[in-house]
Amino acid sequence: DGDVKYHLGYTCGIKTDAGKDIKMTLAPNPSHLEAVDPVVLGIARAKLDKEYANDGKKVCPVMIHGDAAIAGQGIVYEVIQMAQLKGYKTGGTIHIVINNQVGFTTNYRDARSSTYCTDIGKVTLSPVFHVNGDDAEALAHTINLAMEYRQKYGKDVFIDLLCYRKHGHNEGDEPRYTQPLLYKAISKHPDPRKIYVEKLMSEGVLEQQMAKEMEKEFQDELQARILESKQITKATVTSFLKEYWEDYRYGTDEDFIKSPETGVAKEALLKVAKAIYTQPKDLKFIRKVEKEFAKREAMITD
């Protein structure tokens, strides 16, 4: 409550060009930068453990960072340090950094000491691909290459997408106040679509009329979706955890009137203690360990 609606998360199924069905989930993510990172890895690891016999090739976590956030938020360093640990690894994460060279109003030179925002990737000796955000084909090639590397080696991969932010950080930010020279240059710079269309036209792959038709088709689709959404009088939110919680019930006032019985039968406690503190007969323990085990057992049995 109080956060932006597009942070709610979403799950859907898609069919790839190869005819494969893939389930995609955008994890609910609060406006606290990078706080969702360990949640995403936890979801991935849980699925690997529960559904895929820990086969890292079956689930792939993807994180989309900002350049200022990945370099400045400590939680990023924490999850990357866990990337290859036995109890936490997920078979590699694809890190895509939208590097717009500014963090809200902070110039990148004032935001970090490292040369690149992706230098954190050196911790795990991960490959880092620096890609021109205006080169659509280079980005597509890099995504495929990063995925192939991840699937083969089970390691994290970083993509530093060097680009720019067309407008302010949000509706209340006027970037020309804080970065006037940068935004003067950005205002004169053609957008990636225009650059790619001109490239395809120069190569004889695309005609101008076809490009206009494709743009109109896309705009018409967006407009149709807007009109469709306006017909919905009340939005419903389906809990993505519903199936996991269906066997549980909500607590009632009656549940809190009296304290529950949490005691354990003495016989059961003694049985557990015996199982825990009985040393295997086929192993030889040092005297200090034997003494410690006996002392702990006595705490329960005496």
Pin down the residues of each PLM region.
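Cofactor-binding active-site loop characterized by glycine-rich and histidine/acidic residues
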Residues: 1-125, 129
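Metal-dependent DNA phosphodiester-chemistry modules and their immediately adjacent helices/loops
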Residues: 4, 8, 155, 181-203
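Non-transmembrane, aqueous-exposed alpha-helical and coiled segments at domain scale
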Residues: 36, 41-61, 73, 105-116, ...
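Short glycine/threonine-rich loop-to-helix capping motif typified by GTGT followed
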Residues: 70-77, 109, 169-176, 222-226
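Flexible glycine/proline-rich, aromatic-decorated loop/lid segments
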Residues: 89-95, 107-125, 161-194
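Conserved thiamine diphosphate
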Residues: 116-142, 189-211
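Active-site capping/gating regions of soluble enzymes
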Residues: 129-158, 167-179
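Hard-cation-handling environments
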Residues: 192, 203, 207-302
